[in-house]
Amino acid sequence: MSHTRVVVLLGSLRSQSINRRIAETLRDQAPAGTVVEIVDGLGELPFYNEEIDVEGEVPGPVSRLRAQVGAADSVLAITPEYNGTMPAVLNNAIDWLSRPYGASALSGKPFAALGATPTRFGGKWSHEDARRSATVAGAHVVADIAISESTIDREDILAEPEFVGRLLGALDTLVSHQVEAKPAA
């Protein structure tokens, strides 16, 4: 049976971050036929440097990231917002995925960004930045997925059925864009 693979790029390195918990919820509650894989090791990536992005010399964590994203059908960034923008770890991952020039692992893949953070706008600017960077890297950004959730004055947003329903709806939308992009057999 074939399935749709969605890889998740996490913008937070904290083991118990709300954004990791969102990713785990999507992984655990993904509908039949959809596999959600959380990419681990983004913190191990060196900062992008064209001088080490040379065939045969690419660092192992970078090769693994490119292979995992390249084999996926869709990409979902789940991220907080740091100082009004996306975290450096996510920006760096997108930088590595965008290269080598003309061979981006993100090229043509449906991409969305969402998440939660304890700010008034819930990470909106971070998500906009991630979508813009992914677009430049060649991804097909799914514009109708926009969940930037504020956690201010909310004890556990993952205990809110309405919020989890919105997350699962976003996953379905992302997967449907991937299916539309597949050529007819």
Question: Locations of the language-model features?
Answer:
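N-terminal beta1-alpha1 ligand-phosphate binding loop
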Residues: 2-34
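Glycine-rich phosphate/pyrophosphate-binding loop and the adjoining helix
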Residues: 2, 7, 140-185
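Short helix-capping segments at alpha-helix termini
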Residues: 28-35, 104-105, 138
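N-terminal beta-loop-helix "entrance" segment that forms/cooperates
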Residues: 41-58, 154-156
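Short beta-strand elements in bilobed, periplasmic/extracellular small-molecule ligand-binding domains
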Residues: 34-43, 47, 140-149
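A general structural signal for well-ordered alpha-helical segments in protein cores
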Residues: 6, 19, 23, 62, ...
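Cofactor-binding loop segments of dinucleotide-utilizing enzymes, especially the Rossmann-like FAD-
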Residues: 11-12, 41, 116
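Helix-loop-strand module that forms the ligand-binding subsite of alpha/beta enzymes
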Residues: 57-137
